Amino acid sequence: MKVLLLTGLGALFFAYYWDDNFDPASLQGARVLLTGANAGVGEELAYHYARLGSHLVLTAHTEALLQKVVGNCRKLGAPKVFYIAADMASPEAPESVVQFALDKLGGLDYLVLNHIGGAPAGTRARSPQATRWLMQVNFVSYVQLTSRALPSLTDSKGSLVVVSSLLGRVPTSFSTPYSAAKFALDGFFGSLRRELDVQDVNVAITMCVLGLRDRASAAEAVRSSTSRPRQPEHRGVPLQSQTAMFLPPTVPGARTLTETPLRGWPQPKMKSSRQKSKTEKNDGHLEPVTAWEVQVPRVRRLCRGLARPHLFGHD
């Protein structure tokens, strides 16, 4: 009897918070500023917004790649697409990027922060110089972009989307300053969300926590920083056997993106004109994605979350 009662209460609890009512038409004509749009997840997000008819301003460090993405977005039907090449390591770049977007689009409905800056593994990555650079690109620039765009997002009752990493939730070897920057993102935007709620500012904040990518460059960087075998045994089980439970054989030369099951608890419903936070349903296991070509459905589901006021992860 107790089991049935608890099951019923749990079902009511999730039914109260779960509201999957995404309307693709809500993104038609939306004004979107997307960073890190030259490749990977950022590139796929740009294409998804383009298909849905959003007005786009794309930014990244590499202008040639940006031009290619802009051309593809126009072919996919984006009414307006602009780009600005910017190096987020420069303290002046974030404000100029937001100002460019405001001038071109007349305001913002979505600010999607997706850019990253990597670093060499090992002791070099822990140097003050590397840490300062990484914090500027992966954290401080996010704060600067948000601060400059927040007045426009407040006027439009828009959404702020932060693409983060599992390394911002779980400390990992050979990623010291990078992990610190991602932890800082979680703390800053988690606190900002509560501040906006207290001030009755109707801007939704979405934290997207992505898993690890299996890349040859990352493996080589780690191998150069330790003398340990590549596949050490843990409790008698080879590491290769452990990871095989989560990562199936990948497409040759493909990059793997594995989602994390870290989702956390739902937030209470708001009394404002629209609900500010919900949680994505979690199936309780890791779901690997191999190659960007077959990753598109996953990115589309991510984009659905970007159009809704979800908060992925715990606070």
From Swiss-Prot:
PROSITE patterns in UniProt: ADH_SHORT
Molecular functions per Gene Ontology: oxidoreductase activity
Distribution of this protein across tissues and organs: Highly expressed in the brain.
Residue ranges, annotated region (Disordered): 221-286
Annotated EC: 1.1.1.-
Ranges annotated as biased composition (Basic and acidic residues): 277-286
Residues reported to bind NADP(+): 36-62, 87-88, 114-116, 178-182, 211-217
Entry's localization field: Secreted
Binding site for substrate: 165
Active site residues of this protein: 178
Domain of life according to the entry: Eukaryota
GO cellular component, one term: nucleoplasm
InterPro entries linked to this entry: 11-beta-HSD, NAD(P)-bd_dom_sf, Sc_DH/Rdtase_CS, SDR_fam
SUPFAM superfamilies cross-referenced by the UniProt entry: NAD(P)-binding Rossmann-fold domains (SSF51735)
Key words of the record: NADP, Oxidoreductase, Secreted, Signal
The keyword Iron appears for this protein: no
Primary location group: secreted
Chemical reaction(s) catalysed: cortisone + NADPH + H(+) = cortisol + NADP(+)
Family from the record: Belongs to the short-chain dehydrogenases/reductases (SDR) family.
Name by which UniProt lists this protein: Hydroxysteroid 11-beta-dehydrogenase 1-like protein
Organism encoding this protein: Homo sapiens
